[in-house]
């Protein structure tokens, strides 16, 4: 342990493992430690099922009807991967895909007036959807065509819209779209959590809708992917990568102290020994004095013995409840996976409802989601504080990740990873410079 490293990483959450992997591939000498005996930190998958009951202080343990405990891998933080999104690009860039198997999530749904509907995201689906009337469908189709053709480097595609100054609200107005359509475009396609985006320049929203459509075009059914055996496989895949490139891993390793000299990190002390480093990456739990609380997320893990109603008996799906529909500021999300992903016993389903906490009674806030899931065999309720670093780490060279938010995808996490990388390396993380051949996540070469 008494050695010099370029980078020491504390915590094996996904953000930390990806950065550790990328730094190792880039030739840095990396030491990666975690005080826990398991990988994944906040973003781990819990197995066997008995362990989940213990973690939530349910001392009686799972009933026999739950099947074998080791058939379960339950994610603490529910998220799916966008098929054409940044995390998939990082997996391909680093070839971590070789350690993982993915399945396409079977459907994406949106809540309107107490019912759920499939999210239409192609012209054909939009025209067949019950979400809109006939004239609305035509206007929405025009809007989708505009977005598909939009190219920020070609003003001929702008149709009078200025990507840097026209607000998204004005773009919706231009196509005369009604409130319901605006709701599902902003929340189910562009995947915003609130309506703050409406008064921002429209370019980001257009790019988000493009990402959704491109992800959908990749594999059909939905734009989302999910790894067999749960999300805990992701940090482990990147940890393997780091090890292949010479990174050193230590689990179950207590961190006694982070050693600073003249305001700059120089090492980490553990069990009486010091490992020295030039830079440090960690999650907020390792440096409570360098982070601030930025809100809370409630996540309720529900075990079901049936698929969710009105999803066509999907074995996996996402449901978005737009804030407008339930008089809130933030959307409510449901992610559902099942025995088909090797995360639950045969015939069992795991649905996780989550949202940003807005009141003193967070459990009440997710009720609209829980109603869609009834009957529920067992609930596990977690309310987590969200933390963010108080500085950018440029002086201390201590780079702290942000907590995982309520969104059901990894795009915000990837933005954090790219942001930390840029602050550490001084240059942006460049996907285009990928040294590896471009396959897709199922190992097939892109045409």
UniProtKB/Swiss-Prot annotation:
Compartment list: Cytoplasm; Golgi apparatus, trans-Golgi network
Q: Gene Ontology cellular component?
A: cytosol; Golgi apparatus
**What molecular function does GO assign, one term?**
Rab GDP-dissociation inhibitor activity
- Which SUPFAM superfamilies has this protein been placed in? FAD/NAD(P)-binding domain
Phosphoserine modifications at: 427
Cited Gene3D superfamilies: FAD/NAD(P)-binding domain, Guanine Nucleotide Dissociation Inhibitor, domain 1, Guanine Nucleotide Dissociation Inhibitor, domain 2
The answer to whether UniProt assigns keyword Repeat to this entry is no
Any keyword Phosphoprotein? yes
Quick one: a GO biological-process term for this protein? negative regulation of protein targeting to membrane
Q: What is its main location?
A: cytoplasm
> Which Pfam families does this one have?
GDI
Task: Tell me the keywords, alphabetical order.
Answer: Cytoplasm, Golgi apparatus, GTPase activation, Phosphoprotein
Top-rank lineage group of the source organism = Eukaryota
Q: What does this protein do?
A: Regulates the GDP/GTP exchange reaction of most Rab proteins by inhibiting the dissociation of GDP from them, and the subsequent binding of GTP to them. Promotes the dissociation of GDP-bound Rab proteins from the membrane and inhibits their activation. Promotes the dissociation of RAB1A, RAB3A, RAB5A and RAB10 from membranes.
Question: Subunit composition?
Answer: Interacts with RHOH. Interacts with the non-phosphorylated forms of RAB1A, RAB3A, RAB5A, RAB5B, RAB5C, RAB8A, RAB8B, RAB10, RAB12, RAB35, and RAB43.
- Fetch the PANTHER family from UniProt: RAB GDP DISSOCIATION INHIBITOR ALPHA (PTHR11787:SF3), RAB GDP-DISSOCIATION INHIBITOR (PTHR11787)
This chain belongs to which protein, by name? Rab GDP dissociation inhibitor alpha
Q: Tell me the organism.
A: Canis lupus familiaris (Dog)
Q: What is the lineage of its organism?
A: Eukaryota, Metazoa, Chordata, Craniata, Vertebrata
């Amino acid at each position: 342990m008494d050695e010099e490293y370029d980078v020491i990483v504390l915590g094996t959450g996904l953000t930390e493992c990806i950065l550790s992997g990328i730094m190792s591939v880039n030739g840095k000498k990396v030491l990666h430690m975690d005080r826990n005996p398991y990988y994944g930190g906040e973003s781990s998958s819990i197995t066997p099922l008995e362990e989940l009951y213990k973690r939530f202080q349910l001392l009686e343990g799972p009933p026999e009807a739950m099947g074998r405990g080791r058939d379960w891998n339950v994610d603490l933080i529910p998220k799916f991967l966008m098929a054409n999104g940044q995390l998939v690009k990082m997996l391909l860039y680093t070839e971590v895909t070789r350690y993982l198997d993915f399945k396409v999530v079977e459907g994406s749904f949106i809540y309107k007036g107490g019912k759920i509907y499939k999210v239409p995201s192609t012209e054909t689906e939009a025209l067949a959807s019950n979400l809109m009337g006939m004239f609305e469908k035509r206007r929405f189709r025009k809007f989708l065509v505009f977005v598909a053709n939009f190219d920020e480097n070609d003003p001929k595609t702008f149709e009078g819209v200025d990507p840097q100054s026209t607000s998204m609200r004005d773009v919706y107005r231009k196509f005369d779209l009604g409130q319901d359509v605006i709701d599902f475009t902003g929340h189910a396609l562009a995947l915003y959590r609130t309506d703050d985006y409406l008064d921002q320049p429209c370019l980001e929203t257009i790019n988000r809708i493009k990402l959704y459509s491109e992800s959908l075009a990749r594999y059909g059914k939905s734009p989302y992917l999910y790894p067999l055996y749960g999300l805990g496989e992701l940090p482990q895949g990147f940890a393997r990568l780091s090890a292949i490139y010479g990174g050193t891993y230590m689990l179950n390793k207590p961190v006694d102290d982070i050693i600073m000299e003249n305001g700059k990190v120089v090492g980490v002390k553990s069990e009486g020994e010091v490992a020295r480093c030039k830079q440090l990456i960690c999650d907020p739990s390792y440096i409570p004095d360098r982070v601030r609380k930025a809100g809370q997320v409630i996540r309720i893990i529900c075990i079901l013995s049936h698929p969710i109603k009105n999803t066509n008996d999907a074995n996996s799906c996402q449901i978005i409840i737009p804030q407008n529909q339930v008089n809130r500021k933030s959307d409510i999300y449901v992610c559902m996976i099942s025995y088909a992903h090797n995360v639950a016993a045969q015939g069992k389903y795991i649905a996780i409802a989550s949202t940003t906490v807005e009141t003193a009674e967070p459990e009440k806030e997710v009720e609209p989601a829980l109603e869609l899931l009834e009957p529920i065999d067992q609930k596990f309720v977690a309310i987590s504080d969200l933390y963010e670093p108080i500085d950018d780490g440029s002086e201390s060279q201590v780079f702290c990740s942000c907590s995982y938010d309520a969104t059901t995808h990894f795009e915000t996490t990837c933005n954090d990873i790219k942001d930390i990388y840029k602050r550490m390396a001084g240059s942006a993380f460049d996907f285009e410079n990928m040294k590896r051949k471009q396959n897709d996540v199922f190992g097939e070469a892109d045409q």
